[in-house]
A protein has these predicted regions:
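FAD-binding subdomain of flavoenzyme oxidoreductases
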Residues: 1-74
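C-terminal substrate-recognition/cap domain of FAD-linked oxidoreductases
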Residues: 37, 46-169
Length: 169
């Protein structure tokens, strides 16, 4: 039995090259998968920020506050967001250069999870950012649809920028 290996997105190593070779360099004979329970509830945040430096501060604060409850932290630039035609939330694109989609999941069965998240967010310096907090599963999906519509809209205008990367922060 092989010991479990945790996924690590902090850089390329020989093991990753071997795994990504699709069988050319070798065959995987065993795998260990860590499975989590489905979250009881999730809240999606849409955050507009004026600078990358402020985004790093937000990331540090959010990870300190929510730790393992963060199931997604996605970063998008102003140009990508400006091509989205429909926007139910009417967020301000002009004031912000960077947008983050942050998903926080309730794995611990916390009662009133929405209030829990909002109370924790109240310590953030919201003067430099615009935050939209989802209030329902429908709004969660609307925010995710904004993110997922970017590649579709890029294909329509003919310029596609692919930059789905993981970096250590």
């Amino acid at each position: 039995m092989t010991p479990p290996i945790k996924k690590n997105n902090t850089g390329l190593d020989l093991k990753q090259l071997f795994i990504g070779s699709e069988g050319i360099l070798g065959i995987i004979t065993a795998a260990t998968i860590r499975i989590f329970d489905k979250p009881q509830e999730r809240i999606v945040l849409w955050v507009g920020i004026r600078s990358f430096k402020e985004t790093l501060k937000l990331y540090e604060r959010i990870t300190a506050m929510f730790q393992d409850q963060i199931t997604s932290f996605e970063l998008m630039n102003k140009k990508s967001i400006s091509i989205i035609k429909q926007n139910e939330f009417n967020f301000k694109i002009a004031n912000n250069k960077i947008f983050c989609l942050i998903e926080i999941s309730n794995f611990q069965k916390i009662d009133d999870f929405g209030d829990f998240v909002i109370n924790k967010l109240s310590v953030l310096d919201t003067e430099k950012m615009e935050i939209i907090v989802s209030k329902s599963e429908y709004e969660n999906q609307v925010i995710w649809n904004l993110r997922e519509s970017i590649p579709v809209e890029e294909r329509k205008i003919g310029s596609i920028i692919k930059h789905d990367v993981s970096i250590p922060l």
